[in-house]
């Protein structure tokens, strides 16, 4: 008999992350015989642009997608409103579908997952995606000096323990995060209950052998990057990435190598150029490009090396940067800082780049670029061993099998 799963995501499927880190897994699990209903919260503009394409993907893969719309304002109250909005939909679906399992991505949707488990006895997967509550505080979103945010923080810390203890399975992005959870000594939280599944990458898409060398060379010429040492960055910068420190690192590179810092990001270019100017980096030595996700693999091959420095705070123990998976898959050396998830350990194990120490949350102990130990084939092998999307699907399948086909 076909098993039925309800997947809840507060992230939209029309967001790039929704497509790469949710839909791909659901499609893989659907092929193994799980029938999925997917509820996600979509941003109106993104839905207008991408909604039809996502509907088509879901139709082709027999996924019952039920998009709802994300409420942005007023903050806090808007999230409550979204939860109130989702519950009647789920109640109706539960009546008709009789779900066997509810898979909740992060904390907000886990409030619903826990309720469904208590009311209907449905198996509940807490796919925690990191220490979300602490991220909100460390990222300056929740100011604990405010009584309102202090109350919300305490509420979710209490719920966090309930999600961990009452769930049937937990997914952590990192081994460092898993070890931290085990140190909390909570009831019913064991090593066997926690699976580590990092942010994975589709190795068919991020495959340097599948990209024409002449096309990359033409792109390099078009962007005037020939005879330059290209230091790259990919992705948004946001709250967590240390742009000032990355610029400081770039400045240490020998001018004789004619370096240029190329950032592939949809963030406002002028803000980045202004930061570079403050750091006394000439405009001709920095280039900001907005690139479609489908064109990222080819653009990564422009890089001679890539850098990302992330704030090494408590919550980042559970961080798994997707960019690391993509860069290693493409055989690009990665320069990162220690204290962020499993990133440094993976770089060192697979000789995939260079790790720099973190002096504190906001400062990296920058040393000169040194890629003498870099091994391109080992880095690509590391991506296959650790970040392969197919392996990620199999790890989720192990969880589903254990919960849905338990021996009686």
Feature roles, as predicted:
Residues 1-55, 60-66, 171, 248-256, ...:
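N-terminal subdomain of nucleotide-sugar transferases
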Residues 6-8, 225-241, 247-250:
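Conserved donor-binding/catalytic core segment of Leloir-type glycosyltransferases
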Residues 16, 241, 290-299, 306-328, ...:
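Nucleotide-sugar-dependent
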Residues 50-57, 207-224, 378:
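A short helix/loop element that forms part of the nucleotide-sugar donor recognition site in Leloir-type
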Residues 87-92, 111, 115-119, 132-134, ...:
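Membrane-proximal helix-turn-helix segments that form the acceptor-binding/catalytic region
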Residues 176, 200:
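Carbohydrate-associated surface elements
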Residues 264-265, 270-300:
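Nucleotide-activated donor-binding/catalytic signature segment of Leloir-type glycosyltransferases, i.e.
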Residues 373-389, 398:
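A short, well-ordered alpha-helix in the C-terminal region of glycosyltransferases
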């Amino acid at each position: 008999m076909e098993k039925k799963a309800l997947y809840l995501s507060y992230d939209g499927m029309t967001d790039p992350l929704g497509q790469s880190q949710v839909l791909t897994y659901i499609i893989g699990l659907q092929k193994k015989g799980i029938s999925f209903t997917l509820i996600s919260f979509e941003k109106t503009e993104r839905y207008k642009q991408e909604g039809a394409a996502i509907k088509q993907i879901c139709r082709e893969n027999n996924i019952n997608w039920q998009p709802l719309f994300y409420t942005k304002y007023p903050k806090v109250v808007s999230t409550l409103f979204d939860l109130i909005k989702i519950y009647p939909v789920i109640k109706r679906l539960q009546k008709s579908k009789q779900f066997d399992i509810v898979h909740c991505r992060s904390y907000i949707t886990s409030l619903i997952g826990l309720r469904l488990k208590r009311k209907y006895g449905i198996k509940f997967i807490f796919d925690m995606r990191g220490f979300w509550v602490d991220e909100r505080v460390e990222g300056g979103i929740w100011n604990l000096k405010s009584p309102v945010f202090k109350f919300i923080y305490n509420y979710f810390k209490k719920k966090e323990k309930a999600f961990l203890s009452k769930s049937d399975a937990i997914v952590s992005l990192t081994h460092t995060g898993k070890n931290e959870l085990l140190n909390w000594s909570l009831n019913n939280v064991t090593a066997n209950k926690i699976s580590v599944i990092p942010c994975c990458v589709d190795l068919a898409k991020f495959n340097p052998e599948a990209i024409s060398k002449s096309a990359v060379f033409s792109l390099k010429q078009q962007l005037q990057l020939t005879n330059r040492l290209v230091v790259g960055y990919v992705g948004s910068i946001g709250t967590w990435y240390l742009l000032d420190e990355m610029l400081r690192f770039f400045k240490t590179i020998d001018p004789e190598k004619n370096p240029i810092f190329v950032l592939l990001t949809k963030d406002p270019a002028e803000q980045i150029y202004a930061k570079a100017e403050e750091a006394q980096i000439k405009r001709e030595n920095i280039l900001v490009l907005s690139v479609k996700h489908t064109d990222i693999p080819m653009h990564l091959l422009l890089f001679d090396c890539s850098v990302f420095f992330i704030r090494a705070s408590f919550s980042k123990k559970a961080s798994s940067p997707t960019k690391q998976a993509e860069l290693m898959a493409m055989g690009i050396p990665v320069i990162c800082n220690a204290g962020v998830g499993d990133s440094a350990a993976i770089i060192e194990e697979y000789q995939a780049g260079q790790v720099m120490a973190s002096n504190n949350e906001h400062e990296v102990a920058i040393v000169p670029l040194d890629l003498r130990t870099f091994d391109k084939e080992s880095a690509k092998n590391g991506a296959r061993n650790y970040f392969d999307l197919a392996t990620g699907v199999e790890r989720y399948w192990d969880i589903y099998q254990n919960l849905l086909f338990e021996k009686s």
